[in-house]
UniProtKB/Swiss-Prot annotation:
Residues 528-538 have a biased composition (Basic residues). Disordered region at the C-terminus undergoes liquid-liquid phase separation (LLPS) for the formation of a membraneless compartment that stores mRNAs. The tandem Agenet-like domains preferentially recognize trimethylated histone peptides. The lineage of its organism: Eukaryota, Metazoa, Chordata, Craniata, Vertebrata. Residues 471-486 are annotated as: RNA-binding RGG-box. It comes from the Eukaryota. Residues 218-279, 281-351 form the KH domain. Its main location: cytoplasm. Homodimer (via CC domains); homodiremization is required for FXR1-network nucleation. Interacts with FMR1. Interacts with FRX2. Interacts with TDRD3. Interacts with HABP4. Interacts with CYFIP2 but not with CYFIP1. Interacts with EIF4G3; promoting translation of target mRNAs. Interacts with ELAVL1. Interacts with CEP63; inhibiting 'Lys-63'-linked ubiquitination. Interacts with PKP3; the interaction facilitates the binding of PKP3 to PKP2 mRNA. Interacts with PKP1; the interaction may facilitate the binding of PKP1 to PKP2, PKP3 and DSP mRNA. Residues 404-414 have a biased composition (Low complexity). Residues 201-208 are annotated as: CC1 domain. This is RNA-binding protein FXR1. The keyword Transferase does not apply.
Length: 568
């Protein structure tokens, strides 16, 4: 504002230093130095320009000069008109022209200057032009330092922003300034906008730098969230980030969207860790045994839904057999969970506990099945003697190598009006390999004894009948020789076992005994013989091998007991 300094004449005739604030048609708005008087408008005829700063100060006795002085202590100093009366070294005796001749004062050379020869200003002494300022630049234009280069380029005396008119005021003592302003004003506003943007970025960078320096000394954590889980981490409308920022002690949370990196700064490690718990979403899987998948899911998904609700995970997915995204163990099915780290830890605890519970229950169930199996073998595998009643039930237990499930007991009744006697049996003993595994050695001996006590005539008759019907067969003698043509049991003895492996093998003894002891007519006996003959026919290679094995077993059993020898 020193460049727009002018002098205003006061009521006492002295000229005081003022600054031009605005230019009007016939006056100037001025501001007094040190604001010793309020701002006011002064007409042109009371205003003059100050003398040039490089004026030569050659003062001698008798010259009119201007003295920088004041009339009283309440007023500032101004330039008063005076006359030099005497000089002595650097001191001058002056006489004020506006006062009585008797009022003199001794002053130094620095307070004197030659009389200002400038006239009062006129309408064309100062020129003013205006530039409209956009709304986004008004705050920036209020700073006069922003127009320093523009002021120098156009040759203006002063450039300032007028808030009432929202315009830039350019004041100058040269008319050429107005033309330059018209040329450079648009460029000046663009430069202000660019500078403003750069300054704003620099300020933000400075603040960020200061904040980073402060946070670097505090607690902070950095972690990465997968791109497909970033939406869960941010939350709806940034709800998770807002919730994390509300944690007491958290000072800042930064997110690098390009890399999915979160940076959390806080005053304590606990605050930072708590905020991290709201933002860190991960995906993890747990291996579940295949045989327990259904029980882990539960009916209508009730069990797995309860686990999800209690743990707090967002979602759960069961990987299919045709998916190979995750490492898979034999006999295991991966359950994939998505949620915060805390919720993933919760679901691991719940699921591992539930799986352990299911395994323990399964183990107890298997133990119970084994106990039940042993009870069946002990209680149902016992063979009573041949004198049991016709309505008595007979049970057996099967080996795991032959039948996969346990069959129930079956009851069979005899035929005819009576039995031939307890000593009559069929021509075949029960094969030990097909009998109940719980059968004891004593039971087998009893069976062989019954077989050996059968009538020799009856056995011989059957042997001859079978020999005539199958002359080419290898007959089996009573003494225990091996062959396919020997005496056999009834029709249902072997063929029934081959047709129905799950049937009760002890029923053969009962049926054979009943058939041979029944008091029947000749036709009924002939029909029974035909049935026994048909049962001995080989249907397949496997059937022949089975019967051969039974023959060898029966022969060996008879020879061992010494009951197979025949006395001719």
């Amino acid at each position: 504002m020193a460049e727009l300094t002018v002098e205003v004449r006061g009521s006492n005739g002295a000229f005081y230093k003022v600054f031009i604030k605005d230019v009007h048609e016939d006056s100037l708005t001025v501001v007094f130095e040190n604001n010793w008087q309020p701002e006011r408008q002064v007409p042109f005829n009371e205003v003059r320009l100050p003398p040039p700063p490089d004026i030569k100060k050659e003062i001698s006795e008798g010259d009119e000069v201007e003295v920088y002085s004041r009339a009283n202590d309440q007023e500032p100093c101004g330039w008063w008109l005076a006359k030099v009366r005497m000089m002595k070294g650097e001191f001058y005796v002056i006489e004020y022209a506006a006062c009585d001749a008797t009022y003199n004062e001794i002053v130094t050379f620095e307070r004197l200057r030659p009389v200002n020869q400038n006239k009062t200003v006129k309408k064309n002494t100062f020129f003013k032009c205006t530039v409209d300022v956009p709304e986004d630049l008004r705050e920036a234009c209020a700073n006069e330092n922003a127009h320093k280069d523009f002021k120098k380029a156009v040759g203006a005396c002063r450039i300032f922003y007028h808030p009432e008119t929202t315009q830039l005021m350019i004041l100058s003592a040269s008319e050429a300034t107005v033309k330059r302003v018209n040329i450079l004003s648009d460029m000046h506003l663009r430069s202000i906008r660019t500078k403003l943007m750069l300054m704003s970025r620099n300020e933000e960078a400075t603040k960020h730098l200061e904040c980073t320096k402060q946070l670097a000394a505090a607690f902070h954590e950095e972690f990465v969230v997968r791109e497909d889980l970033m939406g869960l981490a941010i939350g709806t409308h940034g709800s998770n980030i807002q919730q994390a920022r509300k944690v007491p002690g958290v000072t800042a949370i930064e997110l690098d969207e390009d890399t999915g990196t979160f940076r959390i700064y806080g005053e304590s490690a606990e605050a930072v860790k708590k905020a991290r718990g709201f933002l860190e979403f991960v995906e993890d899987f747990i291996q579940v045994p295949r045989n327990l998948v259904g029980k882990v899911i539960g009916k209508n998904g009730k069990v797995i839904q309860e686990i999800v609700d209690k743990s707090g995970v967002v979602r759960v997915r069961i990987e299919g057999d045709n998916e190979n995204k995750l490492p898979r163990e034999d006999g295991m099915v991966p359950f994939v969970f998505v949620g915060t780290k805390e919720s993933i830890g919760n679901v691991q605890v719940l699921l591992e506990y539930h799986i352990a519970y299911l395994k323990e229950v399964e183990q107890l169930r298997m133990e119970r099945l084994q106990i039940d199996e042993q009870l069946r073998q002990i209680g149902m595998g016992f063979r009573p003697s041949s004198t049991r009643g016709p309505e008595k039930e007979k049970g057996y237990a099967t080996d795991e190598s032959t039948v996969s499930s346990v069959q129930g007991s079956r009851s069979y009744s005899g035929r005819g009006r009576g039995r031939r006697g307890p000593n009559y049996t069929s021509g075949y003993g029960t094969n030990s390999e097909l009998s109940n595994p719980s059968e004891t050695e004593s039971e087998r001996k009893d069976e062989l004894s019954d077989w050996s006590l059968a009538g020799e005539d009856d056995r011989e008759t059957r042997h001859q009948r079978d020999s005539r019907r199958r002359p080419g067969g290898r007959g089996r003698s009573v003494s225990g020789g091996r062959g396919r043509g020997g005496p056999r049991g009834g029709k249902s003895s072997i063929s029934s076992v081959l047709k129905d492996p799950d049937s009760n093998p002890y029923s053969l003894l009962d049926n054979t005994e009943s058939d041979q002891t029944a008091d029947t007519d000749a036709s009924e006996s002939h029909h029974s013989t035909n049935r026994r003959r048909r049962s001995r026919r080989r249907r397949t290679d496997e059937d022949a091998v089975l019967m051969d094995g039974m023959t060898e077993s029966d022969t060996a059993s008879v020879n061992e007991n010494g009951l197979g020898k025949r006395c001719d």
